[in-house]
């Protein structure tokens, strides 16, 4: 959890509901909200991995408090951590029941039975996941379960300002190359090299996309997203026509992203992964500092200390020409 609100233990919990049907399909519902960040895909992967079935078998229904009540906000980069673990717990309960039924069918001990790519194997005997699901139904074995997870090892006393509000920390590093026009104050990012600690990534492709998006969002925060108020305190930058957000031209032409290898999370998160939604935003500070370095190199009289975020053209010109009035 990254924000102050997530120092509340009550928001660090999640539930999930899993059903296995007699045709071998799996239905999943959990408390996380999909907003394009790939959460549903990641949690589906978790269930797929638990049963060792193709992900196509897993069908996710939209977040609904009729199915999983009292959901926590999908915020502070906690979605995969808490919902993924809740889904794993629910699926694990069902798998244990199915394993017990498989041991009766094969007349083998559960320890000798393996779930592998949609098959249930024991020695030279095998059956499909669908066949086992049907066998469970015929023998009145429940194929539904809920799962619940609460983040461990966290506490916070707001009055004493003491405690351990975060389960773990995420690390990253970035190097950026920037260019400025000393006549207009315009700036561009030319290159960014990022390495991000995602633990054992649940989905490297999704995580790289999150890193790209977070970094570009950070560029907007530090270079163009400026608030203007009139003398009466009314906000003037009310929409896209007045509040400038980053566009495709603000993405570095050379954009290199690497996930830290062989660095599983030391804490027992889902598959030893780490949060990746918001941390990369702060790596855009490397671009802001590159702009300050460019200003310092522009002339002997430039004053990079004048540059405050967001680094708009007028602010860059003021720093280049050491003009305190701009």
Model regions and ranges:
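Flexible, small-/acidic-enriched active-site or ligand-binding loops
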Residues: 42
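Short, flexible loop/turn motifs enriched in small residues
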Residues: 9-14, 20, 171, 251
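C-terminal catalytic domains of large/alpha subunits in multi-subunit enzymes
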Residues: 4, 45-326
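Conserved small/polar residues in nucleotide/adenosyl-binding loops
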Residues: 1-9
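Structural motif
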Residues: 25-31, 190, 205
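Glycine/charged-rich beta-loop-alpha catalytic/anionic-binding loops adjacent to active sites
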Residues: 22-29, 268-274
